[in-house]
């Protein structure tokens, strides 16, 4: 993917990732090639030999995404040099069973299939790459962040590959599974009091950085590398997967990096697209009062600097019951194990789809998996 074929802002993020300070080259070597119906028949049928399978070629239609690209070469699986090269190019699923008749089509990008298990792998890469390029993060340095968990996992995943120490501050209310994963990846995790919220965790992180010249605060709530990376990668993937045909995009807002980056790209490339931000009860994005909520990953007690209000057409508030109810429906009806923020995003997407009506298209993201919240009783309404 030559940078000028994707978008002019993508350059800093693409390229094989060498040591800090090394020049980078194209990162297109890991895009898989396609398998046509005849090839698939031969592969599955063992080239027609003993035990071959009979396959109806007419039922082998293209996947509803652009993960597979056309090629005359024999398809083969690629080998990555490190785990970070496997972030992105996630598939998109059309939610055919959950969407009611007469509503717009709804497509969900399954970001829990990133190696770190969430969409936050992308923000982590974008933030670290820019910090290296600007000289803010040097070899042997320490990455510090306040996180609900997923960004911390992404930072730890990259830190272990890049030789950085990672120190994270996580409010106690967030799931233990995520904390265990961060620690397994070598991160030092400090739990902060629930009463202090994310603002308290951020304050603790900034205090640590102030006393350590080798430490870098990732700052996902204010670092514009967060939305910029989504603009350069996630948005482009979604646009290509949908062949540029999208009428509304609906995303949960925590840092709002995913929303802001993708909405900005779509506004530039899909005229008339409607961008909808999703927040949970107790969030102040739409001017409400801060308060408690069970949904993890979205809902803020302050307005992040990474929220671009200029590309936001609407904010939909989804309460805990509707978010967790949709999580159960996604699992039981679509076979999708979504986290609670994904449940909220899909619930809001269904509202938008009903309004738009048949023939229109709504795109959303499922940021992470329900497996990350089993201790929080995600299928029983959460705790």
Regions found by a protein language model. Give the residues of each.
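Aromatic (phenylalanine/tyrosine) cluster motif
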Residues: 13-14, 30
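Intrinsic disorder/low-complexity segments enriched in small, polar and charged residues
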Residues: 34, 40-43, 54-57
């Amino acid at each position: 993917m030559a940078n000028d074929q994707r978008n002019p802002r993508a350059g800093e993020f693409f390229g094989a990732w060498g040591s800090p300070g090394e020049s980078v080259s194209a990162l297109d070597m890991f895009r898989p090639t396609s398998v046509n119906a005849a090839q698939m028949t031969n592969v599955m049928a063992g080239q027609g030999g003993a035990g071959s399978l009979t396959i109806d070629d007419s039922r082998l239609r293209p996947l509803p995404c652009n993960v597979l690209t056309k090629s005359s070469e024999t398809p083969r699986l690629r080998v990555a040099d490190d785990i970070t090269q496997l972030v992105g190019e996630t598939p998109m699923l059309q939610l055919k069973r959950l969407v009611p008749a007469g509503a717009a089509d709804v497509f969900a990008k399954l970001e829990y299939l990133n190696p770190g298990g969430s969409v936050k792998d992308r923000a982590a890469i974008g933030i670290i790459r820019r910090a290296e390029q600007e000289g803010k993060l040097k070899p042997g340095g320490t990455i510090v962040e306040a996180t609900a968990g997923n960004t911390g996992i992404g930072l730890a995943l990259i830190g272990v590959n890049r030789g950085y120490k990672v120190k994270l501050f996580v409010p106690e209310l967030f799931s233990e599974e995520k904390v265990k994963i961060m620690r397994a990846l070598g991160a030092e995790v400090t739990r902060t009091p629930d009463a202090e919220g994310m603002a308290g965790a951020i304050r603790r992180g900034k205090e640590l950085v102030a006393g350590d010249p080798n430490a870098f605060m990732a700052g996902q709530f204010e670092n514009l590398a967060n939305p910029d990376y989504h603009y350069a990668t996630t948005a482009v993937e979604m646009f290509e997967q949908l062949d540029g045909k999208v009428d509304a995009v609906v995303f949960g807002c925590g840092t709002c990096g995913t929303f802001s980056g993708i909405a900005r790209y779509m506004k530039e490339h899909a005229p008339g697209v409607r961008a909808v931000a999703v927040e949970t009860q107790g969030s102040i994005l739409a001017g409400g009062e801060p308060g408690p909520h069970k949904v993890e990953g979205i809902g803020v007690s302050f307005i992040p600097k990474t929220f671009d209000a200029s590309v936001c057409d609407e904010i939909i508030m989804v309460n805990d019951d509707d978010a967790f109810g949709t999580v159960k429906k996604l699992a039981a009806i679509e076979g999708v194990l979504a986290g609670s923020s994904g449940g909220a995003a899909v619930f809001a997407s269904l509202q938008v789809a009903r309004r738009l009506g048949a023939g229109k298209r709504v795109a959303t993201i499922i940021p992470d998996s329900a497996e990350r919240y089993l201790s929080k009783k995600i299928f029983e309404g959460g705790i």
